[in-house]
Amino acid sequence: MLAIENYLILSAILFSIGTIGVLTRRNAIVIFMCIEMMLNAVNLTFIAFSRHLGNIDGQVFVFFVMTVAAAEAAVGLALMIAFFKNRESIDVEDVNLMKL
């Protein structure tokens, strides 16, 4: 059985990769994928602490985070489709060009 430190290190690495991806990429789809990776890293932390402490609350909270992530993905994809229809691009730098 692995120690909790191993799970936390893996979670920190995944979260760092996601953060770097959000800060360095311009493609909206890649940014959303990096945000999902960050949420999964947080979920891994919740599961690790839940198992370590013998409490099920962390595992229940993961289901709420997954539900919010699914809703975020649906709304984000709808926004990207609408943006692509208008600008024929999904680069986040082009978002500033949109007028209200």
From Swiss-Prot:
Reactions this protein catalyses: a quinone + NADH + 5 H(+)(in) = a quinol + NAD(+) + 4 H(+)(out)
The keyword tRNA-binding is annotated on this UniProt entry: no
GO molecular function, one term: quinone binding
One BP term from GO: ATP synthesis coupled electron transport
Gene Ontology CC: NADH dehydrogenase complex; plasma membrane
The keyword Nucleotidyltransferase is assigned to this record: no
General function of this protein: NDH-1 shuttles electrons from NADH, via FMN and iron-sulfur (Fe-S) centers, to quinones in the respiratory chain. The immediate electron acceptor for the enzyme in this species is believed to be ubiquinone. Couples the redox reaction to proton translocation (for every two electrons transferred, four hydrogen ions are translocated across the cytoplasmic membrane), and thus conserves the redox energy in a proton gradient.
Protein family according to the UniProt entry: Belongs to the complex I subunit 4L family.
Protein name (database record): NADH-quinone oxidoreductase subunit K 2
Source organism (scientific name): Citrifermentans bemidjiense (strain ATCC BAA-1014 / DSM 16622 / JCM 12645 / Bem) (Geobacter bemidjiensis)
